[in-house]
Every structure is written in structure tokens, then in C-alpha cells.
Amino acid sequence: MLPTRDEAMALIRDGLSNNPGPWGKHSLTAAHCAEKIAAACGDMDAEKAYVLGLLHDIGRKFGVRHLGHVSDGYAYMMCLGYDEAAKICLTHSFNNHTINEYIGKFDVSDEEMKMIKTELARTVYDDYDRLIQLCDSLAGAEGVLDIEDRMNDVKKRYGFYPQDKWDSNMRLKQYFEKKMKKDIYLVCEKDSFVPEEIG
């Protein structure tokens, strides 16, 4: 189950009132990319893709956490009955289905870690999981970024970027470009899209 676009935006506004930051505009950019790519694929629901892109980082509502935003987002969406959004909160950080590739601090309790590992192990990825992983790697707070620039930015901030995850993001880009038969940056309006202010 998923909220509507308007309900999802209300959740983002509420999240930003609790924890303001660039994650809001990053989420808008991810949602924009997801909607455009899904529409260009022809066999995906663009509205669903938009909502999933918008809510992938909703765990940031609860404060500045690294791995914790994954468990916070998953638990929050499950609590509201939005299981499809909860799945994306979990899967967007793990391209290769392993917690070992997470970039950032493992700032979770033993219970949260167990939940992430358990749910991740039982999760089967689909094209929506893959799409939001890609869009997370394209989305900056200021707009659509070159995927390699975005990964280098993350590498600079955290000091490393796992090669497996880097390679996976490049494969995702190729996968969706092949599916669309179009350039990802043209579809996502890289040179013109700017996320709106969230008020």
C-alpha cells in the first residue's frame, strides 16, 4: 500500500518541520527522476515511482542518523500501513542486497540491526527498488547530478565508496537506459530541473 502524492508530500513537510535539511529537496529530485524514468520505461507506474522516490529518505524525519534513517523510515512507513514505501526505505541503501556496503555510520541498536538484516534477507528486489537506488544516486538537493559526480561527492564526504556499489549504480544506469532506449540525463531533465521550495 502507498499514500497518494499529496499525502506523501504532507509526510515530507511534516518530516522537514521535525528535521529541516537538504534531504527534502534531495527527495523531490529523486521523485522527479523516478517519475520521468518510470514513464519512459512504459511498463512501470510513474505515480507509484514518484511517491516511492519522495519517501525513500522519510526516516530522516526522526533526526540526523546514518544507517538509523533506514530503520526509522521502514518502521514509520510500516506503522502507517505503507508497506511498499517501507520496502523502499529499506532497499534504497543496499544495491547489492548486503548491509556491508552501507556508506556511513552504523548508528543503530542491536535490535534495529537485526530488523534491517532480517527484512533485507527476505526482500526480493523489483524494478522499483532498482529505480529508487538509481535515483538516489542521481539526486542532489540542487537538482539532477551526473551519477559519477554524485558518487564522488559521497566518497569525499565519507572517505570511501565501495567499488561494488559504484559498479552497481553504473549497471543500474545502463539497465534503465536500455529499457527506455534514451539517455538518463535527458529523461531526468538534468540541465533544467530545479526542486521547488517545500513550504
Residue ranges of model-derived segments:
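Acidic-glycine-rich active-site phosphate/pyrophosphate-binding loop
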Residues: 1-8, 48
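Generic N-terminal amphipathic, Lys/Arg-enriched alpha-helix
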Residues: 5-19
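Active-site helical microenvironments for divalent-metal-assisted chemistry
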Residues: 7, 101, 157, 164
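Divalent metal-dependent catalytic cores for phosphoryl transfer on phosphate-bearing substrates
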Residues: 13-16, 40-154
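A short, charge-rich alpha-helical start-of-domain segment used by transcription regulators
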Residues: 22-24
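Charged phosphate-binding loop/patch that engages nucleotide di/tri-phosphates or the phosphate backbone
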Residues: 160-199
